[in-house]
Amino acid sequence: MTKILLVEDNEMNRDMLSRRLARKGFDVAIAVDGREGVDMAQSGEYDLILMDMSLPEIDGWEATRQLRVSQGAERVPIIALTAHAMAGDREKALEAGCDDYDTKPIELPRLLSKIEALIGNHS
């Protein structure tokens, strides 16, 4: 089963997205801030990380930078999630080390196609 780490501080967004992904057959673990996300990503075996970019403790930009130079998570695909779609955000996310970028509100079919493009069909 494909393991996804969802790093999201907003409880409503977190619960909705984790339930929707679980219904699609993904094993979803949750981190509620950037620091917890970095710690979990370094200690766990995840196939993909969904990273909210507006997080407490350390934001998603910095968390992604840290993961890209850390042992254990440096090659795990990361999709940036943001509600603040500003010009240049996609480029900023890619420069920080994200593999793709998606905007909130999340459209599940669009997100699933991005996940599939990064990790292929999950089992």
Regions found by a protein language model. Name each.
Residues 8:
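Conserved acidic carboxylate
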Residues 15-23:
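Charged docking surfaces used in two-component/phosphorelay signaling
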Residues 18, 106-115:
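C-terminal output helix
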Residues 45-50, 55:
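Active-site beta3 strand of CheY-like receiver
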